Amino acid sequence: MKYDIRQAAQALVSQLKAIDYERLPISKYNKRYIARLKPVLSYYMKIYADCILKGLESIGSSPEEITLIDYGGGSGFLSILAKQAGIGRVIYIDLNPDSVDTIRILKELVNTGPDI
């Protein structure tokens, strides 16, 4: 299990770094936000993967049985990783409507993402 989530995180980093965010129809705010994350994306993905692993270990359920709520989801990268790692249901919540639009676009580009 640990290897799968960490492997998914590494693969996702490659996918996300390959995206030209400046060409996407997303807000300037989100372009700046993601541009600041991009150089340290591997670092954050490792943290996200570790959080998912610790959560799964403490709950003791299989990933497919879990609902993860990404409250204040920002870039949505945690939501994408959770879904890619096999979490059953992923709910993304952010008060910024531009961030919600961005995660919808990213979900199409990487072929996975939050359910809501």
Predicted features and spans:
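Conserved N-terminal segment of class I S-adenosyl-L-methionine
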Residues: 1-116
